[in-house]
Structure formats: structure tokens, C-alpha cells
Design a protein with these regions (language model features):
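Conserved "right-hand" nucleotidyltransferase catalytic core of DNA-directed polymerases
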Residues: 1-9, 14, 114, 129-134, ...
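A short acidic-Thr-Gly-centered motif at the start of a beta-strand
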Residues: 1-2, 63-67, 410-426, 682-687
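Gly/Thr-rich phosphate-binding beta-strand-loop-beta motif of the actin/hexokinase/Hsp70
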Residues: 2-37
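Active-site-proximal helix-loop-helix substrate-binding element of RNase H-like nuclease domains
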Residues: 29-31, 36, 40-64, 68-217, ...
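Short active-site loop/helix that positions an aromatic residue
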Residues: 79-92, 113, 284-289, 433-448, ...
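Conserved pre-motif C helix in the palm subdomain of viral-like polymerases
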Residues: 208-214, 433, 662-682
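Short, conserved charged micro-motifs
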Residues: 706-712
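A common structural junction motif
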Residues: 716-724
Length: 741
């Protein structure tokens, strides 16, 4: 069967940052161009300015036939193309959209294969002969923004400036209404071109995108996903198409309160400082004049100053700093994000990205960021029904919130998950029970830990009791320690809730109690190295997880195969030899009225490049060219390797990423958890359920006649053929909103 490749270029008054579905649903959104190609044929283009030209008619016919015949249709970012087809295609061109099952996504193939999920970066990464046209982004900025071109051009003829601005506001797209002469010129990318030249370049850019996308897909064809992973991609399309239902009327009310509170805080800040809160440089200078000890106003510095040097600020300085902190409360920004992303029917679509996490394949979230919604405190959680009733009745205001509950931003952020609801209906809210703590011992074959679950023990409570902390802390400590986290990994997320001494104690206690897990860290690291040294063969880390190193096209890579048969891909892997060294020095401890004592203080383990012998390590220290100088003597050293691969670093940046045994075990554990969740969601769909929300080990579904919570849980817990004896269990509830922690 042939495959068609397609790329849309569109225009809209809606901001694309509101998500593809919200953008496409806007009545102003129209298709400007689309390029389509069958297999290896040259792309043909439909264009809005010449819809009846032979080429446009051919492109339209090809698209109609592909849809009618059920032929696979490939695009780089199917989330966008599917949304445009859902809302715009029939409205503008009279064509019913393709079935979701027809879509194939090259961006998903990039994510699954370890390549960058950007067409330009993927083409560069794969060293293709065809590259994305770099001027394209600038051309999109001109032709897709319905006001941009008018901004770039001077008023035409004797039209007055005020009339030109009116034309800009009311015209759907000036170039399409023949309101701008084709021979006018504008500045772009350091040069000038006429509107006609720009439009022709835009059409060429659209053609080229199809060519480059097709080449990326061809290059990655040897890494095509398995049928199960493809089924997961199609499930993800259906789930995103269903959308997450949100209470838009209540969101609007809270958004109004947030804006009012922001205005109030900004007014107070101006009264104290004479500045707007957004004037960061001026605000820093003002605060320094009132005792602020930091050198910037970034979140980390401000938090450090408030913790250590707050008393150095005078009264006005403290008030101003507190207001800036309140205004920067990030969690409350989910409310406007949910408003912006909501489609006209009150559903947020396209918020989940399948295979968004490179090292696990887990879903990630964009827009409202559902995966990190603020967890309400116990006190607030009990009050949520009351607060929500006041909100629905229109009786909530910032003054009342402050008096009854505290900081309005804190309260509104705590409400964010409760806006996920279907008016007049209930939803299923289900998550797997202690799933990571179950998967890890199952992967490494540790029956001792698995027996605890079979006996119904709460492993997080066991850790909490051993350390004298609550269950939440026990869970955090357990999850961090089991993946080779050191005391800092425990201390940082828990902050003031745990001391450094207790964090060290927790790590030592976990490692002593779980030698099988500690051994597995080394086994996973060693298996990576064995695979690198012996390419083309599979090397077992455990009975459930194995590694292989492939040097074949499209790039060298380590594959970590999970129980489901799915591979986590690590491009351009390496294992660099290093020496781990520990140092000590004597510290004199003086206590008033007592004889001074000498205490030995040890460093944490530090790394040195290369495999060094004791004499080389000592020589390195003696050179005095490193941070190691303050230490007096070496107390231990051993040789190991530092593992690295090429991957996602942060935001849109890609580069060298370091990994290690515990991190690999974490990827295997969380990746297997995702496979369980995906398998369960697909099974739930087969039983007639409609999952619309997934986060890590949690899923939400609609309640409807003929469906039950028990059946939804049973479907999610269906044991797959690739792990039939796994002790999978889940907890769930039925409520009017998303509530589960």
C-alpha cells in the first residue's frame, strides 16, 4: 500500500502557543497551502490564491483519494495536521477528515528512535542531503500571522495610518484579499523581497518540508515501532482527540480573581518602590538599597536570601520582596493555561505527548502541564468542596479567600486539578499501587521484596517507620534511593523536612537493607559496557532486561530492551574510564571547657578522568590545580566508567547526557510502568471505556451507563502476555473531578 506525505501551512488570529486543537478550532483559522506527495513522487501543492489551478486540483484529488482509500498518511507533527483536518478541512475545502488510524507521525518516530523531535534538527542529526529551508520560520511569521504582513508594509497609497490600522484589525489575511500589491517589498532574514517573492518562497518551503520529512522517515524506517508501540501511538491520538474536560465557567471566575489579585499586588509594589514588578533590574537596585543580600532576583537566589538573610532587609524591603515572590508563584499559571487551551466545547485537546520522555517513553504534557499539578495540602483538600461551592455561586473574592484560607494564589493553584471535571457526570480516577516499587524487584528477580507485596505489606510505610517519618516522606526516600540516589538526591526535594545527617542515614539504611538493588546498579552499568565492547549481540542484565549495541544505520546506538519488547534507544553511546577518589582531613573541634578533639572529615566521592593508579592520583592532588587541594590524604579510590549518550538536555537543547547504572534501572522501571499503563488503557478502550488523561501511573476515564469503576480498574490491571505473573494492582475512586494524589 502506498503512503502519502503531507504538510499544511495555515493562518489564524489565534496564537499557536494555545495548542494545535485550540488554534485549529478558532473560526479564523484557514489553510493557506498544503503539499502532498505519494511515496517518492515530487510533492504537489494546493494554494489558497490559486485553488483552481491544475496543480491545486491534483493535490486536492490526491488528498481526497488517500482519505477515501484509507491509505496511511504521514506528517511530521500529526498532532497539528490531525487538528487542522478535524476543524478546518471540511469547513474550508468540503473534505471529511481522515480516520485517526490513517495517520503516521514522523516526529513520534524521532522521539521513539532517540532523534530530536524537530524537523530541522532531525535532518541535521541524521546528516540528510535534504535539509529544512532556514528561511521558512521567518516566512511563517509573515504569512501565518494575520497581522504580521501589514505591520511589515507601509500604508498603501493615500490610505491614512488610522484606516490602515483598522484594515489590519478587520482583515482575515490582507494578502489573500488582494489588499496588498504583490510587488511591495519587505525586510526579512537580513534582506528584502517582494510579497510575490516571499509567497513563492513560502510555497517552496512547504514542498521542501514534505521532502525532508519523507527522508527523515525513510532514514528511521529500520527503527519502525513494533505493532504494540504503534497501537500506543494511535491510542494517544484518540485520547488527545477526546480531550480533557474542564469547568470553563469556574476557570473564568478564578482567572478574574487572579487578575484582580495581581493588579492589587502590583499596586502595592508600586506604592512601596515606585516601580513596576516587571522592572527587574531597577527592582534589584532598589532592594539592594533596602538590605537585599542577593546579586539577582532569580527564584533560587531569592529563596536563599529569604532563608538566610531575610532579617538584613528593612521593613519596606521585606514587604516588596514578599510581593515579588507572591507574583512569581508559578503554580497559579496553570489556570490561564487551561483557559487558553480549552476548545469551544470545554475540552483541552493535544496536551499529552506519547513518548515525550526519551529515557522511558513515558507521556509528557504541554500547555497546562497536567503531570505536575499542585498537590493541595491536607487542610485545603478538606475545604475544596466548600471553596468550590462559593466559587460556583459567585461569592468568592480575594479578600474573603485571604481571611478564611490564606494566600489566594496558593488556594487557586491548589484548585487546579479540581477544574478537570465533566459537568453533571463523574469520572474514574485510578492509579497503579506502588508500581515502581513492584516493578524494580520484578525486573531484577528479587523475590524477597516481591514477597512483601504478596503479603500485602506497604513498602513505603516500612521505610517511613524505619526512619521515623510519615508515609509521604517514606515514599519519596524509597523512590530516590532505589535508583542510586545519594544523600543530596534525598535532601534537595525534601528541603527542610530532612537534615543532611538524616538524608545520609536514609541512604545508608536503604543500601544496607537492599543489597540486591545495589548489585543491580552495577550489573546494568557493566552490561552497557559489555554491549559496547561486543556489538551486534544481546547481553542480559537480568532475565527481563537486555542490552545491545548496534553500529548500523542510521546511527550507532545502545538498545535497552524491556519486558514488553520495546527498546529504549541511546544514540552515540560511550563509556569513559574514570577514577573515583575519596579524601579526608583532620578537623579540630573545640568545645568550651573541654580539651580540643580531632575529628576526621571525609569528602564525597569525586571523579577524575581516566583510570589512574594511586601514584597518579596523589600526583594529581600534589599539582594543586583542582578543587581537591584542601584535602590532606586519599582514603580510597576505585576505577569505573562514566556512561554518556546524545540526547535531550533541557528545553529544546540536545547534547551529551550522562547516565549510570541506577539511572538505567530507573529508565527500565519507569518504562515498564508506562508499558503496563498503555496496555491497560488499550484494554480499557476495547471494553468500551474512554480514557482521556494519563500521568505516569495514573489514568482518568469517563463514567457512563453500562460502565463501572471496577471494570475500568480490572481493564487497567490486565496482565500482558509479556509479564503474566507480575503482581499488578490499582486503587481507584469515582468523583466529580480529578482528585487523586
Amino acid at each position: 500500500m502506498p503512503t502519502f506525505s503531507i504538510d499544511f501551512e495555515t493562518t489564524s488570529a489565534c496564537d499557536i502557543s494555545y495548542g494545535a486543537y485550540r488554534y485549529a478550532a478558532d473560526p479564523s483559522t484557514r489553510i493557506l497551502l498544503f503539499a502532498i506527495a505519494k511515496d517518492d513522487e515530487a510533492p504537489v501543492v494546493w494554494r489558497i490564491d490559486e485553488p483552481d489551478s491544475p496543480e491545486s486540483c491534483k493535490a486536492l484529488y490526491m488528498f481526497r483519494m488517500a482519505i477515501k482509500d484509507g491509505t496511511p498518511i504521514r506528517a511530521f507533527n500529526v498532532g497539528f495536521e490531525a487538528a487542522i483536518c478535524k476543524y478546518v478541512l471540511e469547513r474550508q475545502l468540503g473534505i471529511k477528515p481522515p480516520a485517526l488510524e490513517q495517520w503516521r507521525c514522523t516526529q513520534f518516530l524521532c522521539r521513539r528512535s532517540g532523534a530530536p523531535p524537530s524537523l530541522a534538527k532531525a535532518a541535521e542529526f541524521l546528516k540528510l542531503g535534504d535539509q529544512k529551508n532556514p528561511i521558512g520560520k521567518a516566512l511563517i511569521g509573515v504569512f501565518s500571522d494575520q497581522n504580521k504582513l501589514v505591520d511589515l508594509l507601509p500604508p498603501k497609497g493615500d490610505i491614512k495610518d488610522k484606516d490602515w490600522k483598522k484594515l489590519k484589525r478587520t482583515s482575515a489575511s490582507p494578502i489573500l484579499e488582494d489588499e496588498i500589491p504583490w510587488d511591495w517589498s519587505f525586510s526579512i532574514a537580513g534582506g528584502r523581497m517582494t510579497v510575490r517573492e516571499g509567497w513563492d518562497a513560502f510555497i517552496s518551503y512547504c514542498r521542501q518540508d514534505v521532502v525532508v520529512e519523507r527522508e527523515v522517515a525513510r532514514k528511521l524506517a529500520k527503527m519502525e515501532p513494533s505493532p504494540d508501540v504503534l497501537a500506543g501511538f494511535l491510542f494517544d491520538l484518540r485520547m488527545n482527540d477526546r480531550g480533557v474536560p474542564v469547568d470553563v465557567p469556574s476557570l473564568k471566575k478564578v482567572q478574574h480573581l487572579i487578575v484582580r489579585y495581581e493588579e492589587e499586588l502590583s499596586g502595592r509594589f508600586r506604592e512601596i518602590t515606585g516601580l513596576n514588578p516587571s522592572q527587574t533590574a531597577a527592582a534589584l537596585k532598589w532592594l539592594k538599597g533596602h538590605g537585599y543580600a542577593g546579586d539577582s532576583l532569580n527564584a533560587a537566589t531569592v529563596a536563599d536570601v529569604r532563608k538566610k538573610d531575610y532579617d538584613k532587609l528593612d521593613a519596606e524591603g521585606r514587604k516588596a520582596l514578599d510581593i515579588r515572590v507572591a507574583l512569581s508563584f508559578a503554580a497559579v499559571k496553570k489556570v490561564p493555561a487551561m483557559m487558553q487551551w480549552a476548545c469551544p466545547d470545554g475540552r483541552i485537546r493535544g496536551a499529552f505527548t506519547f513518548y515525550g520522555a526519551q529515557k522511558t517513553g513515558r507521556w509528557t504534557s504541554q500547555g497546562p502541564q497536567f503531570q505536575n499539578m499542585k498537590k493541595p495540602g491536607k487542610k485545603i483538600k478538606k475545604l475544596v468542596p466548600y471553596i468550590y461551592s462559593l466559587l460556583a455561586a459567585g461569592e468568592l473574592d480575594n479578600e474573603l479567600v485571604t481571611i478564611l484560607f490564606g494566600n489566594p494564589y496558593e488556594i487557586y493553584a491548589s484548585l487546579s486539578r479540581y477544574f478537570v471535571r465533566i459537568p453533571g457526570q463523574q469520572i474514574y480516577d485510578v492509579d497503579f499501587a506502588q508500581v515502581e516499587a513492584r516493578i524494580l524487584p520484578a525486573l531484577i528477580g528479587c523475590e524477597r521484596i516481591l514477597d512483601k507485596f504478596r503479603r500485602g505489606e506497604d513498602i513505603y510505610m516500612d521505610v517511613a517507620n524505619a526512619l521515623g517519618v510519615d508515609r509521604d516522606m517514606g515514599k519519596v526516600i524509597s523512590l530516590l534511593c532505589q535508583f542510586q540516589g545519594g544523600w543530596r538526591a534525598v535532601k534537595v526535594p525534601l528541603g527542610d523536612r530532612i537534615t543532611e545527617a538524616d538524608a545520609r542515614k536514609a541512604v545508608s539504611a536503604y543500601r544496607k537493607e537492599n543489597p540486591e538493588v545495589v548489585e543491580a546498579w552495577g550489573v546494568f552499568q557493566d552490561t552497557w559496557i559489555r554491549a559496547l565492547r561486543d556489538p551486534g549481540r544481546w547481553h542480559n542484565a537480568t532475565e527481563k532486561v537486555k542490552f545491545a549495541y548496534s553500529t548500523k544505520d542510521p546511527f550507532p546506538r545502545i538498545l535497552m530492551r524491556l519486558p514488553a519488547g520495546r527498546d529504549i534507544v541511546y544514540p552515540y553511546p560511550k563509556a569513559r574510564p574514570i577514577t573515583m577518589v575519596r579524601y579526608a582531613r583532620n578537623v579540630v573541634v573545640e568545645v568550651p571547657g573541654e580539651q580540643p578533639t580531632v575529628r576526621e572529615e571525609k569528602s564525597d566521592w569525586e571523579r577524575l578522568a581516566g583510570h589512574l593508579d594511586p601514584q597518579q592520583v596523589a600526583a594529581y592532588v600534589d599539582l594543586g590545580d583542582s578543587f581537591l587541594c584542601p584535602w590532606e590524604r586519599i582514603t580510597g579510590h576505585f576505577h569505573t566508567h562514566e556512561l554518556e549518550f546524545w540526547g535531550h538536555v533541557k528545553d529544546a537543547h540536545w547534547g551529551t547526557v550522562k547516565t549510570y547504572g541506577g539511572d538505567l534501572l530507573q529508565s527500565a522501571t519507569q518504562g515498564t510502568g508506562m508499558d503496563f499503563l498503555l496496555h491497560g488503557c488499550v484494554e480499557a478502550e476495547k471494553r468500551g471505556h474512554e480514557p482521556f488523561f494519563v500521568v505516569h501511573d495514573q489514568a482518568l476515564g469517563h463514567h457512563a451507563e453500562g460502565r463501572t469503576l471496577e471494570d475500568f480498574i480490572e481493564a487497567l490491571c490486565t496482565r500482558p502476555a509479556w509479564f503474566p505473573d507480575f503482581p499488578l494492582d490499582a486503587d481507584g475512586s469515582m468523583a466529580d473531578s480529578y482528585q487523586k494524589d
